[in-house]
């Protein structure tokens, strides 16, 4: 049975890539495409918007009008909008793949609560490579974490609105969990002025926002005499879009529950 997918934020950078990825993937089809109310893109053909030709799917700002046209919603927008979409999907039993970042604790709890009713994949990054990096970081932290200084460095385009990136925070969380630390107390997100000597148990973060950088992350494990770097560089958003569609296909058989890309890729068995 073909999975019908709705894409929120269809006119954005990720939205257009998602439309392309859905169109290029067997077993799924684009059922609906959505934009915010008042957008000049409402009424456009989603395929033409994504640069792949006419698809016959008209961009709309009304989820309710498309109830029969999508089984699953992919959402890479902003927290306030995503939370509204979650409430809609719970009310109408629609599955979700969420790539939005920047949620506060209350937002994350809302996602967890919604997953008791519907199935959700919620991940900070849908790249297969990044999720493999998460596993590598756990292994590196287990061996070196108590003896090496750990720093997470990330760079994104000038339009990104949250910092550090959700991926950088996830990297820190994977490391902290492995070491039995709480990232909220051990994470250092800014250094300025006379900071004093670095504490060994800190997990530092540095953020760069410039130009059109798609996404770059590097984690340093540094000691006197050597430094190990585990890095990932994305050259196209298509890697995230393909991962999100892969997650959507995997989620098709799940009735409810909260999952991430570790589940989708079966990385717990590595």
From Swiss-Prot:
Annotated residues for binding of NAD(+): 9-14, 35, 99-101, 123-126
Pathway field: Amino-acid biosynthesis; L-lysine biosynthesis via DAP pathway; (S)-tetrahydrodipicolinate from L-aspartate: step 4/4
Protein residues bound to (S)-2,3,4,5-tetrahydrodipicolinate: 157, 166-167
SUPFAM superfamilies: Glyceraldehyde-3-phosphate dehydrogenase-like, C-terminal domain (SSF55347), NAD(P)-binding Rossmann-fold domains (SSF51735)
Main location: cytoplasm
GO molecular function: 4-hydroxy-tetrahydrodipicolinate reductase; NAD binding; NADP binding; oxidoreductase activity, acting on CH or CH2 groups, NAD or NADP as acceptor
One GO cellular component, as annotated: cytosol
One record GO biological process: lysine biosynthetic process via diaminopimelate
UniProt catalytic activity: (S)-2,3,4,5-tetrahydrodipicolinate + NAD(+) + H2O = (2S,4S)-4-hydroxy-2,3,4,5-tetrahydrodipicolinate + NADH + H(+); (S)-2,3,4,5-tetrahydrodipicolinate + NADP(+) + H2O = (2S,4S)-4-hydroxy-2,3,4,5-tetrahydrodipicolinate + NADPH + H(+)
Active-site residues per Swiss-Prot or TrEMBL entry: 156 (proton donor/acceptor), 160 (proton donor)
Enzyme class: oxidoreductase
InterPro entries: DapB_C, DapB_N, DapB_N_CS, DHDPR_bac, NAD(P)-bd_dom_sf
Function (record text): Catalyzes the conversion of 4-hydroxy-tetrahydrodipicolinate (HTPA) to tetrahydrodipicolinate.
UniProt family annotation: Belongs to the DapB family.
Keywords: Amino-acid biosynthesis, Cytoplasm, Diaminopimelate biosynthesis, Lysine biosynthesis, NAD, NADP, Oxidoreductase
EC number(s) reported in the record: 1.17.1.8
Species this chain originates from: Glaesserella parasuis serovar 5 (strain SH0165) (Haemophilus parasuis)
Protein name, per record: 4-hydroxy-tetrahydrodipicolinate reductase
Location in the cell: Cytoplasm
């Amino acid at each position: 049975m073909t999975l019908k997918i709705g894409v929120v934020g269809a006119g954005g950078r990720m939205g257009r890539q998602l439309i392309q990825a859905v169109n290029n993937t067997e077993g799924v089809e684009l059922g609906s495409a959505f934009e915010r109310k008042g957008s000049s893109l409402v009424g456009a053909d989603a395929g033409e918007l994504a640069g792949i030709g006419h698809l016959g799917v008209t961009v709309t700002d009304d989820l309710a009008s498309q109830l029969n046209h999508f089984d699953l919603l992919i959402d890479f927008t902003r927290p306030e909008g995503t939370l509204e979409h979650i409430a809609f999907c719970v009310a109408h039993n629609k599955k979700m793949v969420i790539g939005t970042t920047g949620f506060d604790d209350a937002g994350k709890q809302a996602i967890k609560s919604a997953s008791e009713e519907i199935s959700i994949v919620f991940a900070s990054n849908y790249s297969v490579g990044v999720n493999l990096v998460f596993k590598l970081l756990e292994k590196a932290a287990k061996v070196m974490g108590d003896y090496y200084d750990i720093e997470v460095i990330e760079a994104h385009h000038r339009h990104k609105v949250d910092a550090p990136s959700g991926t950088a925070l996830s990297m820190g969380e994977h490391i902290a969990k492995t070491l039995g630390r709480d990232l909220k107390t051990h994470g250092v997100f800014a250094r300025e002025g006379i900071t004093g000597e670095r504490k060994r148990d800190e997990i530092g973060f540095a953020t760069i926002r410039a130009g059109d950088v798609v996404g770059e992350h590097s984690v340093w494990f540094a000691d006197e005499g050597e430094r190990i770097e585990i890095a990932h560089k994305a050259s196209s958003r298509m890697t995230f879009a393909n991962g999100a569609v892969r997650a959507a296909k995997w989620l098709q058989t799940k009735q409810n529950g909260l999952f991430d890309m570790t589940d989708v890729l079966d990385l717990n068995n590595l």
